[in-house]
Every structure is written in C-alpha cells, then in structure tokens.
Swiss-Prot record:
Catalytic activity entry: a UDP-3-O-[(3R)-3-hydroxyacyl]-N-acetyl-alpha-D-glucosamine + H2O = a UDP-3-O-[(3R)-3-hydroxyacyl]-alpha-D-glucosamine + acetate
HAMAP family on file: LpxC
Name of the protein described by the UniProt record: UDP-3-O-acyl-N-acetylglucosamine deacetylase
Lineage: Bacteria, Pseudomonadati, Campylobacterota, Epsilonproteobacteria, Campylobacterales
Protein species of origin: Campylobacter concisus (strain 13826)
Top EC group: hydrolase
Gene label: lpxC
C-alpha cells in the first residue's frame, strides 16, 4: 500500500472556538515522507504534528514552539487519521483550527472535496508489540497488540444526561465516517460561563457543541447518537493518536481518558523501541490489516 496525500488544495472559513473570530483553513498536498505539517500563515512558522511538539493538553491538543502555536487540532487530525492521509500541510491564519460544527464531519467533507492521491512510497504503520498503559487514579488509557484494531472507550459522569457510556469501535475509514465523525464536542453551561468570563470559548454556541445544564441538553435538535458523548471522546482519541506520525495498529482502551492522557500514552509508547515496530504496509501485513484502510 502506498502513502497518500490530498489531490488538490482546498480551503474553508470557520469560527474559532476561543476567540470567536473567522479563521481561514487551507489544506495542501505534500510529497511522500513529509508527514503532517501545521503552518501559521500569519506568523510564517511551521511545525510537525508529533508528540514532542505538543505544548498544552488542558482543554484541547495544542502544538507549537516558542514562536507560536495552533490549538484545538484534534478534530481535524481525527479526520486526517480516519482517512489514512500520511502527508498534508494544514495552514491557518490564527492560533486555532476552526471549530466548524464541533465534530469532524466538516473536515471529512473538505477532504472528500480535495480527493486522495497515492504517492510513490510505501505506507508506514506503527505495530503495537506490547501493552502500554497510563494510569492516573481511576482513569487510564492503554494500547495493546491486536490483529483487529479497535477503540473501547468508557466515560462516567455524575449527570442524568450522560451517566456511564461505553462504545466499541472497530477502526476503518468507512466506520469512522459513519459512526464517529459526526459526534460533537460537549460541555456544561456552568463551565462555559466561567470560561467566557475569562475571554475564552467566545465562539462556543449551540451550532458547534452539545450544551448541557444541570438536567437537560439545551440543543433543540437533541443528540445525533444516543451515546454521542462517548463517541466524541473516541473522535478526540483518533485525533490525538494521529500525532504518532503513522497509523497505530493496535487496540486502544480508555476509561475517563483525556487529551493529556492520550499525549502521555503516545510518549510512553514511543519511549521504548520494544513497545512498537515501524513497518511498511505490504505483503502479508497488508492482507492482515487491509480492512482498517477500507
């Protein structure tokens, strides 16, 4: 199987979650072995999407350096990962990726518009060779060897609308688009009011998030899935794991995970070469994992 990029340059404009201002997003093709490059048009700086460039995981995944950063990359990165794109340049004219509708589906549509082009280089993958786990109190994230990569995620909130939810997702492009990409980010009204008092989340609205008060969902249209909350947590994980730089072929299991735990998992996995193998997807290996990229 060959590496991929997008076939043509595409762009869109959306609102930034934190500033509440319009942001131009441009996606452009790159050559083989370039990886995923994030670029600040307004500052003229670029950085690679990889674990060592993550500088904050408090409310979103943020990559950057001393010269600048790009925040809230996880939904777009989930779409890039879900589509199996190996090489792409992502440019914005501000310090965050536009939130769009709070899910990844707008980015999937943009990638559909761009098309996929295969390059003259073998596709690299990361095979999980032994279990790696990050635990903090009752929360954990784990990756383990698997011939049938899947995400098994459980969340538990002391709230009547959410409660405990678990979702098992077998990874493939088609399943990602159908079952994960449309799941929106969610937040509590009391937290939004606190953030906006600090001039954060100024772009948040019912058009780009599921809002919850003490007892109800505030969005008049309701949920897209009965368990949309846990599906969105999987979306976030797909995006966070994309910073490994190649598709992760292994199981991912989480209880009450977070961007921070996902980042720590990528660091822990790559800290010991016995944990993983970087391989070219061909021959028997391709036959074994073909459906992941279907």
């Amino acid at each position: 199987m060959k590496q991929t990029t997008i076939a043509r340059r595409v762009e869109t404009v959306g609102i930034g979650l934190h500033k509440g201002e319009p942001i131009r997003l441009i996606l452009e093709p790159l050559d083989a072995n370039s990886g995923i490059i994030l670029h600040r048009e307004d500052l003229g700086i670029s950085f690679k999407a990889e674990p060592k460039n993550v500088i904050n995981t408090q409310m979103a995944t943020v990559v950057g350096n001393e010269k600048g950063f790009i925040s809230t990359i996880e939904h777009l990165m989930a779409a890039v990962n879900g589509y199996g794109i190996d090489n792409i340049r992502i440019s914005v004219d501000a310090n965050e990726i536009p939130v769009m509708d709070g899910s990844a589906i707008s980015f999937c549509m943009l990638l559909d518009e761009a098309g996929i082009r295969h390059l003259d280089a073998g596709k690299k993958v990361i095979l999980v060779r032994r279990e790696v786990e990050v635990i903090e109190g009752s929360k954990f994230v784990r990756t383990s060897p698997s011939r049938n990569p899947k995400f098994d995620y459980t969340i538990k909130f002391d709230h009547p609308v959410i409660g405990e939810q678990r979702y098992l997702f077998e990874f493939s492009k088609s399943s990602f688009v159908k079952n994960i990409a449309r799941a929106r980010t969610f937040g509590f009204l009391k937290d939004l009011q606190r953030l906006q008092a600090q001039n954060l989340a100024l772009g948040a609205s019912l058009d780009n998030a599921v809002a919850i008060d003490d007892t109800h969902i505030l969005n008049p249209e309701g949920l897209r899935f009965e368990n949309e909350f846990v599906r969105h947590k999987i979306l976030d994980a797909v995006g966070d794991l994309s910073l490994l730089g190649a598709p992760l072929l292994g199981d991912y299991t989480a209880f009450a995970g977070s961007h921070d735990l996902n980042h720590k998992l990528t660091l822990a996995l790559m800290a010991d070469e016995k944990n993983y193998e970087i391989a070219t997807l061909s021959g028997e290996l391709l036959k074994e994992y073909q459906k992941v990229f279907a």
